[in-house]
Amino acid sequence: MEFRFPCWSMISRNSLEPIQALTSQVFFPLFDETCSVGIPHKEAAVRCSDEVHPLAKSIGAVNTIVRRPIDGKLIGYNTDCEASITAIEDALRERRVANGEALRTSPIAGKTFALVGAGGAGRALAFGAKSRGAQAVIFNRIMREQRCLQMQFQGKLYHMNA
Protein backbone atom coordinates (compact mmCIF):
# COMPACT_ATOMS: atom_id res chain seq x y z
CA MET A 1 0.00 0.00 0.00
CA GLU A 2 1.39 3.36 -0.99
CA PHE A 3 0.57 6.41 1.14
CA ARG A 4 1.87 9.80 2.19
CA PHE A 5 1.77 11.28 5.67
CA PRO A 6 3.08 14.86 5.42
CA CYS A 7 3.44 16.80 8.66
CA TRP A 8 3.08 20.55 9.14
CA SER A 9 3.68 22.64 12.21
CA MET A 10 0.92 25.24 12.33
CA ILE A 11 1.22 28.00 14.87
CA SER A 12 -1.58 30.52 15.09
CA ARG A 13 -3.26 32.60 17.77
CA ASN A 14 -6.58 31.74 16.15
CA SER A 15 -7.19 28.05 16.86
CA LEU A 16 -9.54 27.72 13.86
CA GLU A 17 -7.07 29.10 11.31
CA PRO A 18 -4.83 26.01 10.93
CA ILE A 19 -7.82 23.65 10.76
CA GLN A 20 -9.54 25.84 8.19
CA ALA A 21 -6.37 25.66 6.10
CA LEU A 22 -6.31 21.86 6.38
CA THR A 23 -9.97 21.51 5.49
CA SER A 24 -9.78 23.91 2.55
CA GLN A 25 -10.55 22.88 -1.00
CA VAL A 26 -6.82 23.18 -1.78
CA PHE A 27 -5.58 20.68 0.80
CA PHE A 28 -7.72 17.60 0.16
CA PRO A 29 -7.20 17.34 -3.63
CA LEU A 30 -3.42 17.41 -3.03
CA PHE A 31 -3.28 15.03 -0.10
CA ASP A 32 -5.96 12.41 -0.71
CA GLU A 33 -9.06 12.30 1.43
CA THR A 34 -7.98 12.18 5.08
CA CYS A 35 -6.03 14.27 7.56
CA SER A 36 -4.98 13.77 11.16
CA VAL A 37 -5.32 16.60 13.64
CA GLY A 38 -2.92 17.00 16.56
CA ILE A 39 -2.45 19.12 19.63
CA PRO A 40 -3.72 21.84 20.16
CA HIS A 41 -6.27 21.78 17.32
CA LYS A 42 -8.54 18.79 18.15
CA GLU A 43 -11.31 20.82 19.76
CA ALA A 44 -11.29 23.44 16.98
CA ALA A 45 -11.54 20.63 14.40
CA VAL A 46 -15.08 19.90 15.64
CA ARG A 47 -16.18 23.34 14.40
CA CYS A 48 -14.44 22.93 11.03
CA SER A 49 -16.06 19.60 10.13
CA ASP A 50 -19.25 19.54 8.07
CA GLU A 51 -20.49 16.58 10.12
CA VAL A 52 -19.16 15.09 13.35
CA HIS A 53 -19.43 11.42 14.31
CA PRO A 54 -21.55 10.97 17.48
CA LEU A 55 -18.56 9.71 19.54
CA ALA A 56 -16.43 12.72 18.55
CA LYS A 57 -19.38 15.03 19.28
CA SER A 58 -19.78 13.52 22.77
CA ILE A 59 -16.06 13.90 23.44
CA GLY A 60 -15.85 17.39 21.97
CA ALA A 61 -12.69 16.67 19.97
CA VAL A 62 -11.85 15.48 16.44
CA ASN A 63 -8.47 13.97 15.53
CA THR A 64 -9.31 12.53 12.09
CA ILE A 65 -11.11 14.29 9.25
CA VAL A 66 -12.26 12.29 6.23
CA ARG A 67 -13.63 13.74 3.02
CA ARG A 68 -16.71 11.76 2.00
CA PRO A 69 -16.34 10.94 -1.73
CA ILE A 70 -20.03 11.13 -2.67
CA ASP A 71 -20.57 14.75 -1.59
CA GLY A 72 -17.17 16.11 -0.53
CA LYS A 73 -18.32 16.80 3.03
CA LEU A 74 -15.70 16.68 5.77
CA ILE A 75 -16.58 14.19 8.51
CA GLY A 76 -14.85 14.51 11.89
CA TYR A 77 -14.00 11.42 13.93
CA ASN A 78 -12.23 10.72 17.21
CA THR A 79 -10.00 7.65 17.18
CA ASP A 80 -8.09 8.60 20.36
CA CYS A 81 -10.79 7.30 22.68
CA GLU A 82 -11.23 3.74 21.46
CA ALA A 83 -7.58 3.23 20.49
CA SER A 84 -6.16 4.44 23.81
CA ILE A 85 -8.70 2.85 26.14
CA THR A 86 -8.58 -0.48 24.27
CA ALA A 87 -4.76 -0.54 24.43
CA ILE A 88 -4.87 0.11 28.19
CA GLU A 89 -7.53 -2.56 28.70
CA ASP A 90 -5.59 -5.10 26.61
CA ALA A 91 -2.42 -4.52 28.65
CA LEU A 92 -4.31 -4.91 31.94
CA ARG A 93 -6.11 -8.03 30.70
CA GLU A 94 -2.80 -9.64 29.68
CA ARG A 95 -1.41 -8.96 33.13
CA ARG A 96 -4.48 -10.44 34.83
CA VAL A 97 -4.50 -13.51 32.59
CA ALA A 98 -0.82 -14.05 33.42
CA ASN A 99 -1.84 -14.01 37.10
CA GLY A 100 -4.59 -16.59 36.46
CA GLU A 101 -7.53 -14.18 36.71
CA ALA A 102 -10.44 -14.12 34.26
CA LEU A 103 -12.20 -10.88 33.30
CA ARG A 104 -15.60 -10.36 31.74
CA THR A 105 -15.82 -6.60 32.21
CA SER A 106 -13.38 -3.81 31.52
CA PRO A 107 -10.34 -4.02 33.79
CA ILE A 108 -10.65 -0.28 34.45
CA ALA A 109 -14.28 -0.52 35.65
CA GLY A 110 -14.54 0.78 39.21
CA LYS A 111 -10.95 2.03 39.15
CA THR A 112 -9.50 5.53 39.39
CA PHE A 113 -8.12 6.68 36.05
CA ALA A 114 -5.51 9.49 36.23
CA LEU A 115 -5.24 11.93 33.32
CA VAL A 116 -2.52 14.52 32.87
CA GLY A 117 -3.89 17.16 30.51
CA ALA A 118 -7.39 18.34 29.64
CA GLY A 119 -7.04 18.96 25.90
CA GLY A 120 -8.48 16.94 23.03
CA ALA A 121 -6.71 13.65 23.87
CA GLY A 122 -7.50 14.12 27.57
CA ARG A 123 -11.15 14.62 26.69
CA ALA A 124 -11.13 11.36 24.69
CA LEU A 125 -9.53 9.42 27.54
CA ALA A 126 -11.90 10.91 30.14
CA PHE A 127 -14.87 9.94 27.98
CA GLY A 128 -13.50 6.43 27.42
CA ALA A 129 -12.74 5.92 31.12
CA LYS A 130 -16.23 7.05 32.12
CA SER A 131 -17.87 4.85 29.47
CA ARG A 132 -16.01 1.85 30.94
CA GLY A 133 -17.05 2.65 34.52
CA ALA A 134 -13.86 4.30 35.77
CA GLN A 135 -13.58 7.55 37.75
CA ALA A 136 -11.33 10.11 36.04
CA VAL A 137 -8.93 12.23 38.10
CA ILE A 138 -7.71 15.14 35.97
CA PHE A 139 -4.42 16.99 36.48
CA ASN A 140 -3.97 20.11 34.35
CA ARG A 141 -2.13 23.44 34.36
CA ILE A 142 -5.01 25.50 32.95
CA MET A 143 -7.87 25.48 35.45
CA ARG A 144 -10.52 26.66 32.93
CA GLU A 145 -9.95 23.63 30.63
CA GLN A 146 -9.85 21.35 33.62
CA ARG A 147 -13.17 22.59 35.02
CA CYS A 148 -14.93 22.11 31.65
CA LEU A 149 -13.66 18.54 31.40
CA GLN A 150 -14.46 17.81 35.04
CA MET A 151 -18.03 19.09 34.64
CA GLN A 152 -18.61 17.13 31.44
CA PHE A 153 -17.27 13.81 32.72
CA GLN A 154 -17.84 14.20 36.50
CA GLY A 155 -14.19 13.57 37.34
CA LYS A 156 -12.12 14.95 40.20
CA LEU A 157 -9.70 17.71 39.36
CA TYR A 158 -6.33 18.86 40.63
CA HIS A 159 -4.46 21.95 39.50
CA MET A 160 -0.80 21.50 38.54
CA ASN A 161 1.78 24.25 38.73
CA ALA A 162 4.20 24.14 35.81
Place the predicted regions along the sequence by residue:
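Phosphate/diphosphate ligand-binding glycine-rich loop within oxidoreductases
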Residues: 1-96
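Glycine-rich adenosine-cofactor-binding loop
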Residues: 76-81, 88, 92, 96-133, ...
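Short phosphate-engaging motifs
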Residues: 41-44, 121, 145
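Short acidic low-complexity segments
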Residues: 153-162
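Short, acidic/turn-prone active-site loops that include or flank metal/cofactor-
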Residues: 58-63, 142-144, 162
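NAD(P)-binding Rossmann-fold cofactor-contacting core
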Residues: 131-154
